[in-house]
């Protein structure tokens, strides 16, 4: 059924439709006066390359949410196939205080935790915020990048983790 009536789309039908989309999996992390916190997110998107800007959507009911707002900085760590367990941990399987106990964490310019071995990490300052429904859309200026690992990407689709194999790019 195709409908243009926004009231005709229930929250559960919308969530089911969104579950069909394949998305990269990220750990979004922060540290500063509001404390260290992190969560798993798939709602990350490039906004512009001039200046480099990303957006990330965070649920205002998340236990980590206040730390992100108070700190004003975050790092978007894009996960590889080797990080599926971490994705589950940061999605709520373990308490906030235990989420950073595992692998090596570093820091770039903002001080937000950067996951060693991430596919790529975008170190950002939050420059704007928009409330939409249950979430905030955070507009984030990219201040630094961690080295790109070249590993296989971790995706989430159909309510399961999937792996996107690396392919060799062919030159012209």
From Swiss-Prot:
InterPro entries: Flavin_Rdtase-like_dom (IPR002563), NADH-dep_flavin_reductase (IPR050268), RutF (IPR019917), Split_barrel_FMN-bd (IPR012349)
GO molecular function, one term: riboflavin reductase (NADPH) activity
Homology family: Belongs to the non-flavoprotein flavin reductase family. RutF subfamily.
Pfam (any one): Flavin_Reduct
Protein's name according to its UniProt entry: FMN reductase (NADH) RutF 2
Keywords: Flavoprotein, FMN, NAD, Oxidoreductase
Catalytic activity reported: FMNH2 + NAD(+) = FMN + NADH + 2 H(+)
Annotated SUPFAM superfamilies: FMN-binding split barrel
The protein's enzyme class: oxidoreductase
EC number: 1.5.1.42
Annotated GO biological process: nitrogen utilization; uracil catabolic process
Function: Catalyzes the reduction of FMN to FMNH2 which is used to reduce pyrimidine by RutA via the Rut pathway.
């Amino acid at each position: 059924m195709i409908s243009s009536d926004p009231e005709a789309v229930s929250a559960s039908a919308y969530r089911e439709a969104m579950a069909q989309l394949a998305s990269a999996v990220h750990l979004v992390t922060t540290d500063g006066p509001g404390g260290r916190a992190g969560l798993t997110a798939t709602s990350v998107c490039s906004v512009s390359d001039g200046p480099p800007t990303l957006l990330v959507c965070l649920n205002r009911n998340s236990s980590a949410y206040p730390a992100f707002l108070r700190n004003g900085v975050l790092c978007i760590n894009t996960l590889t196939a080797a990080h599926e367990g971490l994705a589950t941990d940061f999605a709520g399987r373990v308490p906030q205080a235990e989420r950073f106990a595992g692998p090596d964490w570093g820091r770039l310019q903002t001080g937000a935790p950067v996951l060693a071995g991430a596919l790529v990490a975008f170190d950002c300052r939050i420059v704007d915020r928009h409330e939409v429904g249950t979430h905030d859309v955070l507009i984030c200026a990219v201040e630094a990048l961690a080295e790109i690992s070249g590993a296989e990407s971790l995706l989430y689709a159909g309510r399961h983790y999937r792996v996107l194999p690396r392919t060799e790019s062919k030159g012209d």
